[in-house]
Amino acid sequence: MKVSMIVPVYNAEHALFDTLGNLVHQTFFDRYPEEGEILFVNDCSRDRSGAILEILHSQFPDRTRIIHLTENRGPGGARNVGVENSTGEFYLFMDCDDIASPSLMEDLYLAVTEHNPVGSHAEVSRLDSDREYDIAIAGLNCRYLNWEGFALKREFSGVLDEKKKSYLIASEADFRSKIYRRSFMEKYRIRFAERVMAEDEDFSAIVHANVRKVNVINKILVEIRDVEHSASKSLDIASTYEDILNCAIRAYQGMRKCRDYDSFAKAAETLYLRRFAFCLKTLDGLYQDSILTEKAYFEMMQTLRKLSDTMITHSVEGNEWSNACLEPWEKEKMIHFLRDDVMAQMKHEQAGG
């Protein structure tokens, strides 16, 4: 089997009729009969999603496989189950409420298996014994996040130098428009965190930190939709805070294992800074709305500061990736928070000074 597409499904009957057609009619199946599969992982849906998937499988038995989980594992866990049960040399992920181009599988497969590396003669010579791409990346649309036609330039193809790898990490290129070589993912044991949200963010960061060689398609192949019933819209503020904070910690723990971490540390810290800024903004809101007591607020701020002191080793002002990628409010908030006197001042105010 050449390619497996993995699609987690949870309470998605509202979206499936719009999205399934482009999946089962992928051009890949016409060009490579019996060399592709789509694994739909039903994550204990309570609506008619499971029944819809079974009907689809009865119509396309050679292209689809359905896995019904008996325990909810969240989107990350469902993707992990899909990977474990898939057989493709390469695999990719789609969310069930997003729209895939009919050529998604084929275009990504051709890109990741291309035998003509893009780059200088010196680069080609250096890779003569190993010309395999670890991943291939295409572009995507996400109108509600203002990602209109977001795609990397072809110049990013080839072996990643320090600057290219740093850009991938700091810009947080989305996981849904990529195809992954199974042997690469298994080598670094890269999996999704389970039963949490924001699981795709640290996953992508760890992939980018370990990847050596990529091929880029300057083509929009995925449309990410803002769906009213999606899982990410059902979260409360407090749980979102926990998920975003833990996402930063997982990303740090995963990327810190890389031998070349120091070469992309500033880009990695930009990713942490963005999440810490979100957490600070969330805590401020919870405190102002009297959901957090003053004591709880201060203790949580202390926890954030300890994590920041461990994970942030470069000044925000002197970090070129932070300057390029952070929103102005994120940058200003973190510069203030990381001042030496901030926690002492907060403690003084808490004591009534």
Residue ranges and their predicted role:
Residues K2-S4, E37, D202:
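Cell-envelope/extracellular polymer assembly enzymes that use nucleotide-activated donors
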Residues L69-S86, I99:
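Glycine-rich, basic loop-to-helix element that forms the pyrophosphate-binding segment
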Residues R31-C44, R65-L69, C96:
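Short beta-strand/loop segment that forms part of the nucleotide-sugar
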Residues A12-T27, I52:
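Short, well-formed alpha-helical segments that are part of the catalytic scaffolds
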Residues G76-R79, C96-N218, I224-T240, Y287-Q288:
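Donor-binding/catalytic cores of nucleotide-activated saccharide
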Residues N22, N42-I52, E71, S101:
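A conserved acidic beta->alpha catalytic loop
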